[in-house]
Structure formats: C-alpha cells, structure tokens
Amino acid sequence: MQLNSTEIAELIKQRIAQFDIKSEARNEGTIVSVSDGIIRIHGLADAMQGEMIELPGNRYALALNLERDSVGAVIMGSYDGLSEGMKVKGTGRILEVPVGRGLLGRVLNTLGQPIDGKGPIDNDGFSPIEVIAPGVIERKSVDQPVQTGLKAIDAMIPIGRGQRELIIGDRQVGKTAIAIDTIINQKDSGIKCVYVAIGQKASTIANVVRKLEEHGALANTIVVVASASEAAALQYLAPYAGCSMGEYFRDRGEDALIIYDDLSKQAVAYRQISLLLRRPPGREAYPGDVFYLHSRLLERAARVNAEYVEKFTNGAVKGQTGSLTALPIIETQAGDVSAFVPTNVISITDGQIFLTSQLFNSGIRPAVDPGISVSRVGGAAQTKIVKKLSGGIRTALAQYRELAAFAQFSSDLDDATRKQLDHGQKVTELMKQKQYSPLSVAHQSLVLFAAEKGYLSDVELNKIVDFEAALLSYANTQHAELMAEINAKADYNDAIVGKLTALLDDFKATQTW
C-alpha cells in the first residue's frame, strides 16, 4: 500500500490535532545553606508566608522569612542528609492537621500523626493550623461553667465555657496537676478535651497519658505531643495544631477544653527559631512579635453563637452554641510575674490562677493564692448554689490573711479576732484537696455550706480533712437523692437550705468531732 503526500500531510495534521500536552509549572529552588534546623533557599519565587516546602526524602520545611533573593525556612524534624545544592519544591499549601472525633483517645505528634502504636487514625478531614479567630459579632458572652472539680477554683476563681484562664507559677507547684484534674472531671460533662504538651520529658507525658487512662478520661481527650527532644519548629507549632483539633468541636456546636502545657517553652522555641533566622531581638532576646504569637492563639478560644454554628455547618446544627475554653500554663522564674512572656499572657487572658511555692511547700495543695488569683468573666458562669455559698469563703480568707499579718505582732487578741483567725485557718484547711479526686457540684456545695453556716466551729483544725471525708461519705449513703438533685439543678432556695441543714444536723448528731 502506497501513501501519497496528501494523505501523509492529513495524517500528520490529525496527529497534531490530537496531541495534548499539559503544562506543569513547578515552583523550585535550591538550598544554599543548612544549619541548626534552618535552610536558606535561592530561586523559590512566589513562596507564601507559612508555606510548606517539600524537601528530598519526603520531609517538609516551613517558609518563615521571605527576603528579596532568598527564603528562610525552618525544617520540621531532622535535617540529616540535607546539603547545599539540593532541589526543593514549593507546595502552594499551608500546614494542615487531621481533625475529627476519631482523634479522641489518641496520642499524636504536632503534624497529627499517631505515636501511640494503636494504628492509623480515623479523621473527618483536615484543617489549617492558622485560622482567624471568630469576630466580635460571632461571639456570645460566657455564661456556662466548666467545673474543674477543685473547691478552691470552682468557689473562688470560677471558669466559664469559652474563657481563657491562665495557670501561672514556678516549676513543681502543681500547674499540670490542676489541668489534669480538670480533664478528669470532664469525663461525664460532654466537654471534649485537648492536652498539648510542649517541650516536656517523654516520661512525664507518658505518665500523664497513663493517669488519664486510669481515670477513664483518655477516651474523651486528644493528646498532642511536642517533647523536649523534638525540633523547635514542632514545639512552636504544637499549640496551633491542638487548637485546630479543638475548634472542630467548637464550630459544630459542642464544648471543648484545651490545655497548653506550657506556653513558656513554646515562646523559647519561637525565640530560638527567630534568632537563627536573624530576626532582630527585643526584650529578653524575644522577637518583636512574641505577643502576637500568643494573642492569635488564645483569641481562638471563644464561645460562638448559634448563628455562627448554623452557618458553619450549613444548617445541619441549629440553635446550639459552641465553645473552646483555654487553660494556658506559664512557668515563672522565682515567682517573677513581671517578666516579658508572663505579663503578655496575663494581659491576653480573662484571669489567672496563681500558684506559689510557699503555699505548696506548707502543704496547701492546690497551692492557689486567692489574693492575686482572679477570674474576670467566670462569675457569670458559676452555678447558682456555689455562687451563693462561695462569697463568704472569699471574704473569710481575705480577712484571715489581713488579720494573720497583724496577729504576728500581737499576743493579746480579742475574741472576735480570734474567731475570725480560727475560721480562716479552717477554711484554708478545707480548700485542700488530693490530686485525681475532683468533687461534684453537690459535694462542693455541701462542704461550702458547712463552712458558711458555722458547722466547723467546734471541729479541731487537725480533724477538718477527716470531717470532710466523713461528711461526704455520709451524704452519699444517707442523702443520695439530695446530692443527685443538687448535681442536676444546682439551685439554691429555702427548700435546699432546709435539706442541707437537716443533713448536717443529723451528721453532727451521729458523730462527735
């Protein structure tokens, strides 16, 4: 068969018409330096702030410095095997982490990868780690409580859903203990918890996970870990990753609680990255944007209104508000709350729980200093019964602190002063609480009622703890219905007062103290 020139030309035209090539534009650059977890890249045009940059060996870096002729990026993980001259690619994406209910009960790293050996996670999708916080119009005022189960906090420094309450104090004064007790107390409250461990020893984190599991609270909790041995970039990003996981519940009309343990170590990791990127240092060698580092994170903790939830879920959830409550932890050096990072976070949050070494070492645990601890919005969220009964407790402790200072210089005190000092000592003793033993609203109310109505006046100081234990045991066995009623309604009226009075009178009649 012979083809003439016309047929050949037609065939070529057909082939050309059918030929389809897809042009692919790739943003590539070359590594010009590698040192201390920082790479400088030349030729990576159109890079975004915070963009993921793909490195050889399926590793990633985060673009943080965008300069005229180079990009400074921080490597997320190990930088072994990277060298000058290697090619890198821009991905055009910012960092996203998996979110969803399948994360509950799991231990994850900053990137949302499981590290607990329980297999792959079942996530509902991905969320960017940097999200703009809800606006003023989308928020709702805080008016529902988060019960920590700790008398000293729920009575005097109440926390509401959507609040940011700072836990601040020196090392080894029980900051993490308060956070873990709060998580344990949420196992039946419906509040989902996220615990972000930043720069801690792996053994400490393993102990926390074990305690949560023992008390049945791990199934309700996501644990995000950036341990002390991990790269500074992962420690810096861990709180944002945890926050995105918590926002999943907030945006769907549910309540969540997130604990950042602790933000001092995150600030140190960010300072390290900034200095290596040659950004100008400021006070205490922190970069100028260290306030923004924490403010953009903590502003994402909020109570959002029903309209926001309905719009976010495209009408799937109606008439429900969502909340994300944050308990950031800050470690001070020798009680110095006027340092740079502590003052920043105090000004961002809605109050602080201040723990002191002096109280801790004298056996008052939790070592909460009620004089300088404050909750700026929690009062509106306090349960009715605890709010009514706790007012006198705060006053009694304030008067006791004032009188105790004067009593040191005076030996002859009048009866009224002596009674006030005695009452203050007993209330201080009553505020003590063992770790991993949170109390219900009914139990707290009963203890506060006993203190408020003078039932402790004839109980010796060294028997207060035993008195409390016996009282709660008696209430559980003899007055279980009343305890259940208070837990369900938390009302304070004449009928409840009458029942509580009868309970305490019966208890005092059956036992001598």
UniProtKB/Swiss-Prot annotation:
Broad class of where this protein is predominantly found: membrane
Subcellular location: Cell inner membrane
Name of the molecule in the record: ATP synthase subunit alpha
InterPro entries to which the protein is assigned, alphabetical: ATP_synth_asu-like_sf, ATP_synth_asu_C, ATP_synth_asu_C_sf, ATP_synth_F1_a_nt-bd_dom, ATP_synth_F1_asu, ATPase_a/bsu_AS, ATPase_F1/V1/A1_a/bsu_N, ATPase_F1/V1/A1_a/bsu_N_sf
Species the sequence originates in: Aeromonas hydrophila subsp. hydrophila (strain ATCC 7966 / DSM 30187 / BCRC 13018 / CCUG 14551 / JCM 1027 / KCTC 2358 / NCIMB 9240 / NCTC 8049)
UniProt EC number: 7.1.2.2
GO molecular function per UniProt: ADP binding; ATP binding; proton-transporting ATP synthase activity, rotational mechanism
Family: Belongs to the ATPase alpha/beta chains family.
HAMAP family to which the protein is assigned, alphabetical: ATP_synth_alpha_bact
Positions marked as site (Required for activity): S373
Reactions catalysed, as given in the entry: ATP + H2O + 4 H(+)(in) = ADP + phosphate + 5 H(+)(out)
Function of the protein: Produces ATP from ADP in the presence of a proton gradient across the membrane. The alpha chain is a regulatory subunit.
Entry keyword set: ATP synthesis, ATP-binding, Cell inner membrane, Cell membrane, CF(1), Hydrogen ion transport, Ion transport, Membrane, Nucleotide-binding, Translocase, Transport
Gene3D superfamilies: 2.40.30.20, ATP synthase alpha/beta chain, C-terminal domain, P-loop containing nucleotide triphosphate hydrolases
Gene Ontology annotations for the cellular component aspect, listed alphabetically: plasma membrane; proton-transporting ATP synthase complex
Assembly description: F-type ATPases have 2 components, CF(1) - the catalytic core - and CF(0) - the membrane proton channel. CF(1) has five subunits: alpha(3), beta(3), gamma(1), delta(1), epsilon(1). CF(0) has three main subunits: a(1), b(2) and c(9-12). The alpha and beta chains form an alternating ring which encloses part of the gamma chain. CF(1) is attached to CF(0) by a central stalk formed by the gamma and epsilon chains, while a peripheral stalk is formed by the delta and b chains.
